[in-house]
């Protein structure tokens, strides 16, 4: 994508989604950054990027590419983050119901 070098689009069960050309989906990166910022509110911008880089293996320059894409399309990426959270919550609830049934 010429407007956002380093971003590609992938098709999947949830539709077309923005992804780093050599890494995870943009929504996954943004969620990791938001999580790091929430968990470590006193970190500097560079420290947040270093934390996410160390935890994900995604280089800081690629994290910045994802951030730039999010800055242009925040509603799209935030919607994908919300949809992922709903799916994860549903899976966790189903797992818990299964555990409850088996526990008697």
Q: Which functions belong to the PLM regions below?
A:
Residues 23-46:
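Short, amphipathic alpha-helical "recognition" segments used to contact nucleic acids or chromatin
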Residues 2-21, 35-37, 50, 54-55, ...:
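Long, charge-rich, low-complexity intrinsically disordered regions
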């Amino acid at each position: 994508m010429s407007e956002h070098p380093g971003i590609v689009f992938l098709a999947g069960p949830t539709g077309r989604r923005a992804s780093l050309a050599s890494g995870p989906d943009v929504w996954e990166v943004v969620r990791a950054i938001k999580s790091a910022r929430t968990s470590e509110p006193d970190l500097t911008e560079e420290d947040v990027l270093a934390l996410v880089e160390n935890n994900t293996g995604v280089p800081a320059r690629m994290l910045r590419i994802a951030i730039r894409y999010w800055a242009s399309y925040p509603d799209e990426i935030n919607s994908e983050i919300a949809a992922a959270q709903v799916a994860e919550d549903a899976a966790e609830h189903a797992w818990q119901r299964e555990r409850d049934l088996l526990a008697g």
